[in-house]
């Protein structure tokens, strides 16, 4: 059993409201790291802050989430994925009186209804594609981002549905199988020639990838050594251009390796299926021959 949650104190609520006023809703980890609020909120997690802020906003609005959603549909208002607020300066006096004030913002029941996940299945899939790509690009980790990090980013910035983890796992697998994402050591990166994010080219086969990247020069080890010698006399701009070129070549090589691995795995599966079929045919023929010999003996 986990440690029971402590009731929120007025000081903690004041710190939460001031943190939202300073950094904006959804920036729970930033608020927890802020030295102005970390001491008061040291016993709280980002999930605690998110849940408490939702409850405060629903109470301030005077309606529950279902009533607000129904009103929004009647008015034809579009549900926005994220609530933003203008940053403001906060001093100690404001901190003391913050728990007695209510921030004039739209209740989270409307602002954080599950994105366009509720619009239709087709739109939810397309929207989740965009969120995954946004997370990977904003995180910008050199070796890629794992599922937990991607999930944490989306949950911090948006309000996902209850089955979000299942949807995320399914969509990540689909994007990897389609060649739009590259998965290495449980981490995901955007494929160099993927169609995600407005790039028109798409990785569909090793032949197509070779055609699209045939203008990239492949260097042997002696050529690499020679290029490194040349870099000693390069200007800063020339060195940056050379480094960008080397990164592009490395990404292409990794994408080709991933594609080759997928092709090899598919070939192995086909070979196993063919062998199983052959074994079944041989067994059937043996049984038939044995039956024929028994009939002849009789």
From Swiss-Prot:
InterPro entries annotated for this entry?
A: Histone_H1/H5_H15, Homeodomain-like_sf, Myb_dom, SANT/Myb, SMH1-6, WH-like_DNA-bd_sf, WH_DNA-bd_sf
Q: Which CDD domains match?
A: SANT_TRF
- Give the record's GO CC terms: chromatin; chromosome, telomeric region; nucleolus; nucleosome; nucleus
Localization terms from the record: Nucleus; Chromosome; Nucleus, Nucleolus; Chromosome, Telomere
Which regions of the protein are recorded as binding DNA?
28-57
Keywords, A to Z, come to: Chromosome, Coiled coil, DNA-binding, Nucleus, Telomere, Transcription, Transcription regulation
Is DNA-binding tagged as a keyword? Answer: yes
Question: In which domain of life is the source organism classified?
Answer: Eukaryota
Where in the numbering of this chain does the HTH myb-type domain appear? 1-61
- Show the Gene3D superfamilies listed in the entry: 1.10.246.220, Winged helix-like DNA-binding domain superfamily/Winged helix DNA-binding domain
Q: Which Pfam families match?
A: Linker_histone, Myb_DNA-binding
Q: Which GO terms describe its biological process?
A: nucleosome assembly
Q: Domain H15 spans what residues?
A: 124-192
Write out the coiled-coil annotation as residue ranges: 237-278
- What is recorded about the protein's domains? HTH myb-type domain confers double-stranded telomeric DNA-binding while the H15 domain is involved in non-specific DNA-protein interaction and multimerization.
Fill in the subunit field for this protein. Answer: Forms a homodimer and heterodimers.
Physiological role = Binds preferentially double-stranded telomeric repeats, but may also bind to the single telomeric strand.
Output this protein's name.
Single myb histone 2
- This protein's encoding gene: SMH2
């Amino acid at each position: 059993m986990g440690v029971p949650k402590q009731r929120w104190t007025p000081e903690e609520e004041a710190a939460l409201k001031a943190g939202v006023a300073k950094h904006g809703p959804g920036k729970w980890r930033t608020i927890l790291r802020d030295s102005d609020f970390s001491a008061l909120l040291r016993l709280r997690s980002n999930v605690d802050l998110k849940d408490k802020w939702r409850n405060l906003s629903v109470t301030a609005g005077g309606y529950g989430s279902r009533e607000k959603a129904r009103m929004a549909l009647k008015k034809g208002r579009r549900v926005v994925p994220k609530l933003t607020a203008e940053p403001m300066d906060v001093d100690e006096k404001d901190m003391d009186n913050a728990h007695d004030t209510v921030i004039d913002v739209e209740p989270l029941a409307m602002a954080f209804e599950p994105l366009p996940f509720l619009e239709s299945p087709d739109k939810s899939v397309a929207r989740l594609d965009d969120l995954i790509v946004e997370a990977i690009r904003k995180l910008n980790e050199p070796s890629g981002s794992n599922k937990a990090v991607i999930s944490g980013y989306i949950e911090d910035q948006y309000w996902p549905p209850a089955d979000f983890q299942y949807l995320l796992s399914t969509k990540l697998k689909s994007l990897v199988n389609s060649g739009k994402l590259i998965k290495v050591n449980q981490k995901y990166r955007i494929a160099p020639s993927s169609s995600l994010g407005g790039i028109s080219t798409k990785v569909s086969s090793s032949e197509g990838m070779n055609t699209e990247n045939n203008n990239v020069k492949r260097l042997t080890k002696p050529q690499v050594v020679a290029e490194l010698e040349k870099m000693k006399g390069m200007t800063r701009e020339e060195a940056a251009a050379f480094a960008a070129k080397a990164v592009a070549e490395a990404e292409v090589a990794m994408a080709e390796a991933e594609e080759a691995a997928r092709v090899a795995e598919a070939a192995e599966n086909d070979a196993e299926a063919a062998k199983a079929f052959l074994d079944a045919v041989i067994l059937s023929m043996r049984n038939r021959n044995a039956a024929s010999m028994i009939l002849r003996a009789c």
